[in-house]
Amino acid sequence: MKENLVDSHGRRMKKLRLNLLDACNMRCMYCMPEDQKFNKLSDLLSPDQIKTIVTNLTQFGIEEVRLTGGEPLMHPQFREILTALTKCDLKKLAITTNAILLDKEIDFLIENNVKSLNISFDSLNENSFNFITKTKTFQKVLSSILKANDLGFNIKINAVMMKNINFEEVDQFLEFSSKHNIEVRFLELMKIGQALQYYDRHFVSADQIIEKISNNWDLTKVPMPNDSTSFNYIATNGEMKAKIGFIASESKPFCGGCSRLRLSNKGVLRPCIMINEGPNISETPIEQYSAVLNELINKKPNYRIEETKIKMNEIGG
């Protein structure tokens, strides 16, 4: 019999963010330094360990898994891991990716019916994109986004908005959304790891973005689930119609409705993106899960912890 995980604040844990690895083929300015060193493959959870942990967690109400990184498509055993997870009792299996390797894996994703992608795409300007990511992959990423969209993937673009870098592109992102019928979500820069040094200079709030959008677009609120990380709108401007969302982790934190747990690439289960500790469940027998999980979720805060020094690629966004 399944056991639902409900914490002392009445939040039921339903979603797992699974950080496959900390390695990435970008060096986004808010995520990690350019000289970042990564964990060895031998130190990461094996595909069998991942399948066992996720299978066990489904017995405690976990219904959705999102693969994150680093860049999950870089994992040398990505296909083996994905195949294993498709056999777990999940309502949804999704991926957050930078799309550099998406074209290589797109047929495999289709074969395994994984059609939900959150794609990090911080700028529609190639020079700004290169500056943010420290790569020259703009055209590759853009073409992969459009190809996946044409193939029927459910795509959400994640754009971290930053003053004096990409904030002026807000209208362009809405036009892009309208043209391609792709949801664009504007993310606030978070006080996490590498981004701490940029926060004061580049932070832009969701309200500032909405104010800018409202100069040219009419906004209609879209109802969202209580545990949604974003609040969403349909934006219209003449014949243009854009689907947009806001993840306002700093100015409008959603901790009170959070239903997520986070599993590190080494097997550490964390109750919150801002907490860098938790039990390692890589070898935990199923008989001990109830006690371990219930102790963990009652350490899950219902308020926003101000900041953490752990890097985003080590947590998984």
Predicted regions and their residues:
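N-terminal [4Fe-4S]-dependent radical SAM core
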Residues: 1-17, 27-29, 59, 230-232, ...
